[in-house]
């Protein structure tokens, strides 16, 4: 380990005893590193039930931490300073708060944020979205493997996406990380336990950590690593990638997240095992992008493998950015598709909320820009959309083109209440953008004016629910509303409000349904009666005059409302048409520019290839001509000097002049032959006919030469 660098993987991976129980099972979501294929490899689920529990022994080899230790108060902080609340409602059953559970559609849970007691206004304390804080770990044990030390197994079945364990350790900055790499290497530590938390920050579990440090590597793992925001800090957890059976070893892919020493031999024995893991240069083992980023971009494992195979065929090295574990070249090559489902939007937003890399952010934003489904745009807003875009405006503060795209996208978002805009402070951020980029003032000012027209409402709080009657507010939390609808307070009572449609209802809108969180509740969706009905008031009979007057006023009001609604609808349709036309033009420009660049790159590549081919062909031709000319020169050089000997003795021409004449004659004769046919080779021997022709040419040449020589002597 003399050459220490930011290289993936550290400790040897899982070995598998041959005498253990084996189950064949196909894992549909397994990430593999074999040849590109949509079909996952067959994974043999080996169970280690008979292996002795070594948990206590393993705990004696390091300092077991309750929580991560931070080298200073700044490390581990997420980028957003404001806590993001969910919109779930407290749901106590049998003394336990079931709010924000796995199937609750909790916006914090969907975007990898844990709820915090007393900070989330409505979901209540100790909700189901506090797995890191409550240390709700899976039932696991440490055992001894045959090939490389400790491993971790499941002591009971673990369902897909279940939280297994938090990866704890000392959270340090990059300078300290590099120092420790060298220090551990000098101390001859066999295994390092580093994980990148975020750019420039690492978790070191080498000396202080948790049982998660013993999870080994596999080329076809059953677990994955994800980063969650917990009370303003980024924390790293290991989650089940598929259902894990009792007795199975828990593994994840070191090449995605782990940092440490040089490449090491891999013992996972998976069908797709590439034989080693780690090292700075990524090869077959490389996951080119972190799993959450790849999923958010819609990139399949087969696409990564195909790209790796292509690069290997071209003899190119495949390297990741040391700082962020991302292959930028692969990222740039990805074809971006729009978000088509709410799940697509959720994956994109969860990454954007933690994003630091501008290139990744641009690619993810393109997925949103290309999406035109209004229901999905409502989903963007719901998943802390305004908070997310406030951060993105800060991230791209110096890049005017990207800011312009973001502002136009914000203009496309459907109307909602003003509450999200106020809480995220996005209006102040847009004003800051306009101040620093005057060319964006028009769209920015338009956006601010649009938001000013939005209505602000008091949202239902936990206190409102506690003070309400059982037939009303306590059951409101059971209702799952269609996209664009919210429950707000107006004049002390709840209303169903749709800002886009400018509609308020006393009753749940069409499409409303019960939420998942309250399966045991049998209360119907509430319908709010007027005060007189609640008090069982008696309705007085109207006189004929009163009845006609009310009827006339009602008809006038209805006609006026219909006329106003038609005018508003016409204006809304015109504005929407103009907005869609403008957005369509922007998208067409983006696509055209991308196609132009792609075509330009293709033409440049074709030009380079043609130049290389022409140069090679020209060089080849010149080489062939040069060789042929050399052969003819040798051919004539074997004859001409002998013919010239008599001129040297008879005519008394000096030796230097005679040598020069021989060179000139040979050169002329060779050139003549090349001119006739450059591909024709000279004969092996000089024929009589050829020798005769050479003599004739030599005599003619020498006569002219002697004539010139005589004239020269006469002048002198």
Curated annotation (Swiss-Prot):
The keyword Flavoprotein does not apply. Residues 479-511 form the WW domain. InterPro entries: AWS_dom, Post-SET_dom, Set2_fungi, SET2_Histone-Lys_MeTrsfase, SET_dom, SET_dom_sf, SETD2/Set2_SET, SRI. It comes from the Eukaryota. It is found in: Nucleus; Chromosome. Keywords: Chromosome, Coiled coil, Methyltransferase, Nucleus, Repressor, S-adenosyl-L-methionine, Transcription, Transcription regulation, Transferase. Residues 138-255 form the SET domain. One of its GO terms (molecular function) is methyltransferase activity. It catalyses: L-lysyl(36)-[histone H3] + 3 S-adenosyl-L-methionine = N(6),N(6),N(6)-trimethyl-L-lysyl(36)-[histone H3] + 3 S-adenosyl-L-homocysteine + 3 H(+). Residues 597-620 have a biased composition (Basic and acidic residues). Residues 1-42, 515-545, 597-623 are annotated as: Disordered. GO terms for biological process: ascospore formation; cellular response to xenobiotic stimulus; DNA-templated transcription elongation; DNA-templated transcription termination; methylation; negative regulation of antisense RNA transcription; negative regulation of reciprocal meiotic recombination; regulation of DNA-templated DNA replication initiation. The keyword Transcription regulation applies. Pfam families: AWS (PF17907), SET (PF00856), SRI (PF08236), WW_1 (PF18507). It is an enzyme of class 2 (transferase). Residues 539-628 form a coiled coil. Its EC number is 2.1.1.359. Residues 515-524 have a biased composition (Polar residues). Residues 81-136 form the AWS domain. SMART domains: AWS, PostSET, SET. Residues 262-278 form the Post-SET domain. The AWS and SET domains are necessary for transcription repression. Belongs to the class V-like SAM-binding methyltransferase superfamily. Histone-lysine methyltransferase family. SET2 subfamily. Histone methyltransferase that trimethylates histone H3 'Lys-36' forming H3K36me3. Involved in transcription elongation as well as in transcription repression. This is Histone-lysine N-methyltransferase, H3 lysine-36 specific.
């Amino acid at each position: 380990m003399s050459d220490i660098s930011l290289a993936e993987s550290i400790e040897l991976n899982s070995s598998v005893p041959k005498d253990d129980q084996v189950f064949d099972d196909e894992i549909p979501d397994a990430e593999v590193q074999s040849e590109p294929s949509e079909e996952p490899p067959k994974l043999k689920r080996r169970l280690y039930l008979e292996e002795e529990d070594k948990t206590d022994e393993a705990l004696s080899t390091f300092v077991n931490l309750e929580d991560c230790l931070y080298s200073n108060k700044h490390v581990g902080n997420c980028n957003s300073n404001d806590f993001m609340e969910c919109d779930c409602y407290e749901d106590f059953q049998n003394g336990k708060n079931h709010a924000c559970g796995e199937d609750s559609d909790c916006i914090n849970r969907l975007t990898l944020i844990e709820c915090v007691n007393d900070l989330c206004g409505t979901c209540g304390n100790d909700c189901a979205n506090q797995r890191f804080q409550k240390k709700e770990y899976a039932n696991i044990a440490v055992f001894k493997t045959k090939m490389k030390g400790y491993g971790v197994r499941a002591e009971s079945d673990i369902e897909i996406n279940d939280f297994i364990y938090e990866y704890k350790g000392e959270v340090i900055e990059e300078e300290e990380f590099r120092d420790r790499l060298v220090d551990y290497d000098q101390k001859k530590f066999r295994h390092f336990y580093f994980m990148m938390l975020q750019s420039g920050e690492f978790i070191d579990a080498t000396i202080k950590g948790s049982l998660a440090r013993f999870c080994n590597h596999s080329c076809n793992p059953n677990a994955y690593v994800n980063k969650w925001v917990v009370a303003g800090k980024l924390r790293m957890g290991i989650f089940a990638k598929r259902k894990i059976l009792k007795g199975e070893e828990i593994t994840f892919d070191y090449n995605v997240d782990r940092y440490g020493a040089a490449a090491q031999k891999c013992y996972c024995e998976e069908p797709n095992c590439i034989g080693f893991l780690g090292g700075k240069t990524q090869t077959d083992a490389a996951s080119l992008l972190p799993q959450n980023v790849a999923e958010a971009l819609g990139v399949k494992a087969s696409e990564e493998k195909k790209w790796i195979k292509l690069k290997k065929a071209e003899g190119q090295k495949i390297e990741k950015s040391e700082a962020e574990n991302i292959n930028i070249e692969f990222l740039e090559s990805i074809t971006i598709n729009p978000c088509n489902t709410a799940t697509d939007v959720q994956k994109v937003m969860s990454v954007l909320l933690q994003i630091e890399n501008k290139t990744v952010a641009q690619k993810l934003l393109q997925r949103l820009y290309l999406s035109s489904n209004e229901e999905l745009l409502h989903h963007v807003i719901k998943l802390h959309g305004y908070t997310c875009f406030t951060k993105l405006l800060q991230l791209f503060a110096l890049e005017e083109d990207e800011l312009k795209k973001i502002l136009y996208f914000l203009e496309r978002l459907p109307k909602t209440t003003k509450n999200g805009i106020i809480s995220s402070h996005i209006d102040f951020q847009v004003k800051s953008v306009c101040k620093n980029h005057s060319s964006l003032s028009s769209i920015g000012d338009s956006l601010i004016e649009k938001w000013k027209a939005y209505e602000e409402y008091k949202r239902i709080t936990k206190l409102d629910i506690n003070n309400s009657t059982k037939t009303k507010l306590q059951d409101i939390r059971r209702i799952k509303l269609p996209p664009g609808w919210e429950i707000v307070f107006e004049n002390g009572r709840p209303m169903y409000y749709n800002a886009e449609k400018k509609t308020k209802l006393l009753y749940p809108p069409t499409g409303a349904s019960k939420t998942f969180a309250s399966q045991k509740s049998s209360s119907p969706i509430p319908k709010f009666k007027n005060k007189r009905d609640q008090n069982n008031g008696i309705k007085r009979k109207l006189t004929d005059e009163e009845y006609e007057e009310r009827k006339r006023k009602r008809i006038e009001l209805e006609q006026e409302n219909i006329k106003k609604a038609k005018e508003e609808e016409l204006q809304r349709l015109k504005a929407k048409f103009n907005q869609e036309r403008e957005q369509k033009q922007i998208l067409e420009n983006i696509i055209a520019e991308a196609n132009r660049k792609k075509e330009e790159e293709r033409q440049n590549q074709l030009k380079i290839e043609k130049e290389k081919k022409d140069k090679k062909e020209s060089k080849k031709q010149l080489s062939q001509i040069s060789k042929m000319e050399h052969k003819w020169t040798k051919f004539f050089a074997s004859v001409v000097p002998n013919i010239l000997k008599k001129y040297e003795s008879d005519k008394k021409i000096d030796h230097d002049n005679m040598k020069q004449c021989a060179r000139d004659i040979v050169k002329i004769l060779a050139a003549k032959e090349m001119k006739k046919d450059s591909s024709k080779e000279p004969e092996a021997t000089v024929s009589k006919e050829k020798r005769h022709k050479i003599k004739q040419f030599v005599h003619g040449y020498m006569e002219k030469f002697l004539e010139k020589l005589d004239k020269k002597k006469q002048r002198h």
